[in-house]
From Swiss-Prot:
This is U3 small nucleolar RNA-associated protein 25. One of its GO terms (cellular component) is small-subunit processome. Component of the ribosomal small subunit (SSU) processome composed of at least 40 protein subunits and snoRNA U3. It comes from the Eukaryota. It comes from Podospora anserina (strain S / ATCC MYA-4624 / DSM 980 / FGSC 10383). Belongs to the UTP25 family. It is found in: Nucleus, Nucleolus. Keywords: Nucleus, Ribonucleoprotein, Ribosome biogenesis, rRNA processing. Residues 1-133 are annotated as: Disordered.
């Protein structure tokens, strides 16, 4: 039964059938596709390079090309597509599970209510959403759901405090009750939305909570896969036993096999997620495990303890951001490097998956394997923002598009909402991030259409300025920008008129040892060119450190800044993210814009000035921080000054705010 209005009107019936008719026409016209070879055998185009990737540190270009080719071969897979009907009864994960009509898998995926769900889908299609702000557990919940014409509310899910509250497959419940029967604060906050198939943006991920979040994501993904697989196997048995004249309509599948997509920043983060999955499924056999260890695991520690905890958590191990990995599950084994169309879970970095999809220019485009994704997990989204976010957007734009080829699909078994081109309204998207940003908010707005609703979970911010390791005079100056598009020009004009004169006036000894922190690379280029070419600042010597500076270049800039040869140092947020330089000699910090990551404010505005005090380069409490902001910096500003202050700073008539 299709999830559309059950009107008897012929015109509406024809309209509702149109997606299925179009799909079948397209598949008939398309030639059968041969077995695919999943290999990245084309060099990345310049546009596909991560915007913030640091330049190679050493080695000539030929050596780098060889290394890149070798790295690409790590994930190469040569394997034919399997017959989706070739699943044996002995592959059942659990033989004695009883059907529970209250199970979220049933109510959301397998057997959605034909009376209540279609109006929600229609409201989501029309962009009619209602948002409510409610306290939930230990955080704030911004809850949105499709608003139907009858105005019926969609309440928040019931609390979940332990494994016993979950509808888990028997074998998973047994493992979890032994490992962790009760939940902590983070798990109690996340679990109700995760296991009830709500879209979720969780904005309080920390190093300390990361393992709990991974474990929950792994458990939910496996539970979804096991239930999907067992339903198919049991229905196969029913069809095999059915009489020839018995009309059984058993719709239990999508177009292609992959059901879960996990977007992760590095190979090491992939290793951590895989380990969480293995700790729950506990397979007897692991096919291609040695190959996985060789290509993904680095056991030697690369960083000393003086690097911040979040930096070591992200970049320790194999920090390559170019990978994609298919994983296939059977009752007793897992297989690494399975062909995408034979995989249950796809692990990938945004860049790796973008390259696997291909490009129109090369006429090698394939994203059919994303057509039936029902669960997307985006972990460490704040780290992905420091890569090329356009790759993430590209991937979401290609999710749940009806396939160009059949791939051996039995259309009599495909769920109705797939045939009706409604899959994106049933897909669950879960994003874990250390903080919220406009990019993440837009991702939730533009690509999360779940009929069951979506939530943003975010704690109130006390403000990073309270935790600086040194006393400093901090001045926040607000400038006006009429629109978001006009913000860059307004910011630059304010900088040249209000900030630059402080560096150029004749007795401006304070200009020495000034670090200018610039989050955006485009803004960095603009300011760099201004210092290089404008006669107003010709007397101000300056150096630069961006994400593209190699190690020797950055070392020279730091040295010249420390000795005073360069009065000003321009420093980008991505350079700090990827390197976490300990820059010495800073007496004044000017923030062209606030960092997205509030930890960076503490490290730069506090940590750099603290080092200068300890080396007696600046007197105690005499360090200066000057911050430029507009109303469009609301999210960043809240994390720095705190939730209780941000409203006044954005709305009050005064435009200067001092903190000590």
């Amino acid at each position: 039964m299709s999830l559309v209005d059950s009107d008897s009107d012929e015109e509406e019936d024809a309209t509702s059938a149109q997606p299925y008719v179009n799909l079948m026409k397209r598949l008939i016209e398309t030639n059968p596709q041969k077995a695919k070879r999943r290999k990245l055998d084309h060099a990345p185009a310049e546009d596909n390079q991560p915007e913030a990737a640091p330049a190679p540190e050493s080695g000539d270009e030929d050596e780098r090309d060889d290394e890149q080719e070798e790295q690409r071969d790590v994930d190469e897979v040569e394997e034919a597509e399997e017959d989706t009907a070739d699943i044996q009864p002995e592959d059942l994960f659990d033989e004695d599970d009883d059907l529970d009509e209250t199970d979220p898998f049933e109510t959301h995926i397998s057997n959605p209510d034909e009376n209540t769900v279609p109006p929600r889908v229609r409201a989501a299609q029309n962009g009619k959403w209602k948002m409510q702000r409610q306290p939930f557990e230990s955080t704030r919940a911004y809850w949105s759901y499709p608003q139907t014409e009858d105005g019926q509310e969609l309440p928040l899910p019931a609390p979940i405090t332990s494994v016993s509250n979950l509808h888990l497959k028997k074998r998973l419940k047994e493992v979890m009750e032994f490992k962790r029967s009760t939940f902590g604060v983070v798990e109690k906050t996340v679990a109700p939305f995760l296991f009830n198939y709500r879209d979720m943006l969780y904005c309080d991920r920390t190093v300390g909570s990361s393992q709990d979040l991974r474990n929950l994501a792994a458990l939910h993904a496996l539970n979804h896969l096991y239930k999907t697989r067992d339903r198919v196997i049991k229905n196969n048995a029913r069809l095999a036993k059915a009489d020839a004249n018995e009309d059984l309509e058993l719709r239990d599948q999508g177009f292609t096999r992959p059901k879960v997509l996990m977007l992760l920043p590095t190979r090491q983060s992939c290793v951590k997620m895989v380990d969480s999955i293995l700790s729950v499924c506990q397979p007897d056999q692991q096919e291609n495990r040695k190959r996985f260890e060789d290509g993904y695991i680095e056991k030697l520690s690369k960083f000393s303890d003086d690097k911040p905890e979040d930096f070591r958590d992200l970049f320790s191990g194999n920090d390559d951001d170019m990978f994609r990995l298919g994983m296939k599950f059977t009752r007793k084994s897992v297989k690494y490097f399975s062909q995408f169309y034979n995989s249950d879970i796809i692990f990938a970095s945004p860049l790796g998956l973008r390259m696997a999809i291909g490009s129109e220019e090369e006429r090698k485009v394939d994203f059919d394997f994303l057509s039936s994704i029902e669960l997307v997990i985006v972990d460490q989204a704040d780290a992905l923002l420091m890569q090329n976010w356009e790759h993430v957007e590209f991937i979401f734009e290609h999710l749940n598009i009806q396939p160009k080829d059949a791939h051996g699909c039995d259309f009599s078994r495909v769920r109705s909402w797939y045939l009706d081109d409604q899959a994106k309204y049933f897909r669950q998207t879960v994003v874990f991030s250390a903080f919220n940003t406009p990019e993440l908010a837009e991702l939730m707005r533009a690509h999360c259409h779940n009929w069951a609703g979506k939530v943003r979970l975010q704690q109130e911010c006390p403000g990073t300025i309270q935790y600086l390791p040194v006393k400093a005079r901090q001045t926040f100056s607000r400038f006006d920008a009429p629109t978001v598009a006009a913000d860059p020009d307004a910011r630059f004009n304010y900088f040249t008129k209000a900030i630059v004169p402080l560096l150029t006036k004749r007795n401006a000894k304070d200009a020495n040892s000034t670090l200018i922190f610039i989050p955006s690379y485009l803004d960095f280029v603009r300011v760099r060119n201004f210092f290089a070419n404008n006669p107003i600042v010709e007397a101000v010597t300056f150096g630069t450190i961006s994400e593209y500076a190699d190690i020797p270049e950055a070392s020279r800039a730091r040295s010249h800044f420390l000795t005073g040869r360069h009065k000003v140092l321009l420093y980008t947020e991505r350079a700090h993210h990827f390197r976490r330089y300990q820059i010495k000699g800073v007496k004044r910090v000017i923030m062209y814009s606030l960092p997205d990551n509030p930890l960076f404010y503490r490290e730069i505005a506090g940590g750099y000035l603290q080092k200068s005090e300890q080396s007696l380069m600046v007197e105690h409490g005499q360090g200066v921080v000057r911050v430029m902001f507009s109303k469009y910096d609301l999210m960043k500003l809240e994390r720095i000054v705190g939730t209780s202050r941000v409203g006044k700073m954005i709305k009050e008539q005064g435009d200067t705010f001092d903190f000590v």
